């Protein structure tokens, strides 16, 4: 009798994206159980190295969002223990998590990025650092947590940035606000997917809009001119390769169609462990390509390796 493959699904953790990670991880664990895998769900804590060393699974499915699972830290633990894992490796994870460094790499590779600065909270507190509208966001967090859009109506940056309980680090990315359509595209099995346009029911595609059913409308395929559509796909793969990503990644874009050609297309960021909840974009893109949720999750596990 063939032994069932034992997969550890790493979920939870202690980042600001914990709740999303729990939802993603549990959905994937359920899928693997339906496919006949032996599954252990691990809510990651600071003793994760000891837990994994004792458990010794055949592989690990990474369903952590934010620190420490998306920044290369847990990947380093898994490599030390010689446990194959999914998604991107140590370097690509660390690089993509640091938005300022990732932008530099992508720009060098010919992927257009938003004009911006990396500043401390103290520097931002002195007043407007660029002409509004602009965006202030943490250098190393996802799911749009800690993100503020500063418009002409703001006399000064939001005071929440300077409170003692601010949890998103002292270093912040300040970027010129890019108007236009919100687009996303993923890389699955080494190829770019189709493109989704996200239409938030609120002004900004924030945490609530991303993870609350009905808070945003997804247009798939996105309503774009064919050459723009293909350019989004090309840039998605280019960003994935430039950062050294593996497995699944997702790139987010803005497109200002008032600018001629593809000049209004800007890559905002690349997510190395995109969400896998019921409202997440990657499962929707995969389904459009004929890949069921369970098939997608199984492929992620089968793709796991120590060569990331």
Curated annotation (Swiss-Prot):
Name of the protein in its database record: D-alanine--D-alanine ligase
Function (record text)? Cell wall formation.
Q: What's in the keyword line of the UniProt record?
A: ATP-binding, Cell shape, Cell wall biogenesis/degradation, Cytoplasm, Ligase, Magnesium, Manganese, Metal-binding, Nucleotide-binding, Peptidoglycan synthesis
Per the UniProt record, the source organism is Rhodopseudomonas palustris (strain BisA53)
Binding-site positions, ATP? 130-184
Q: Where in the cell is it found?
A: Cytoplasm
Q: In which pathway does it act?
A: Cell wall biogenesis; peptidoglycan biosynthesis
SUPFAM superfamilies reported for this sequence: Glutathione synthetase ATP-binding domain-like (SSF56059), PreATP-grasp domain (SSF52440)
Gene Ontology MF annotations = ATP binding; D-alanine-D-alanine ligase activity; metal ion binding
Annotated ATP-grasp domain ranges read 103-302
